[in-house]
């Protein structure tokens, strides 16, 4: 027999043997058909989704402030058809148009964008499981990588700290594009890459990695580029002409954010290791598994690992050069490739150990990725009352309390100037919250003042990007301001010598410790 060797050997591979080079016909992945799922498989799928719904709901209190920005966009879109914070006032600060659209679409039948987030997150995790199992059979002819990778994604503290944002959606589409690339399915890959770019503009970097590494003829690459362009064109044309920019205004806001001082994305990991040592180490728990003898693997595995390593490195280099702040969700672009490479490394060792005394024990290692989250739950209690890793000034529960106070005590026509985080308070108060994220006239001013002299060659690109930019009407003039005040020894309450003060509430997170957040009259 001249076919390739069995992928499930009963003894370790012989020295020098490449493992595995190709898939035998018996285990090659079949493309899905439209036939109905057998009842047992359907029952398992329903049980998995139900379990995921319960699991995801347990993290309801951990949604960070930036997640509520996307919820605010989705709710406004549902209620008024406006792309922005408030009806009749367009804005362009939602970093993930696809995530906002999905939340709005699912929120419509559920009558709640919050319930939509829980359902979408559960579906994204279920989709990840299906794709990871497919990737596992593609590379190894068995399911271990799929289950190991799924546990790694579903229990990673950093990923769980971004629920409500686009991170899990991004991971899902990233793996979808990778699987299509490995299976040589170019049109679905191009669609996946297009959706990935709509989930975050960074998705274009994966396209830049995949095309040079592909061995397909130039004609197939050109066709894939056309499909990719057709997928992203409707949104980007709308964004360019109607919103005045191909990319969200947050690019200008974040690049110009001076709140982080000298700390940037390049040295952000050191910051999180210092401020969140256990949580950061738990997120990176599987990193040592990325080191394994890749030269003993077949071409398909080598190509997969090359794609993952190249993408993570390219993204890190670009974000470091831009000098953007080290927001924790930016590191998802290194985390996703790391988790996938680690899952491949773990599966490599499990398959090599088949037929040895330790083989059965290694299969139980599928639960190892959950150790970090379990350690955090043991140390801090579960469910968590804030995201394991976050940079907020108050928990979502505290911000919601402040927003509810505003709803009860401020007139609907009154606006509040926000100096700080806006998402949760805006969502909970149903009042006009004014800053650069909600008021497009602020972003107009920042764009006019922005200097890109340190980025050679970007000037003409920016001129083209803002070709359709027009001035936008401001939100109503603020009658109040929402500002942080230094922590003190006294109980929450307005200082007796400050007649403008209307309310002071405590904010406390692992990031800032304790601080007071106040609402003051501006008139």
Over which residues does each language-model region extend?
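N-terminal acidic, proline/glycine-rich, low-complexity intrinsically disordered segments
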Residues: 1-9
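Intrinsically disordered, low-complexity proline-rich regions
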Residues: 10-14
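Membrane-proximal envelope and lipid/glycan-remodeling enzymes
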Residues: 15, 19, 23-523
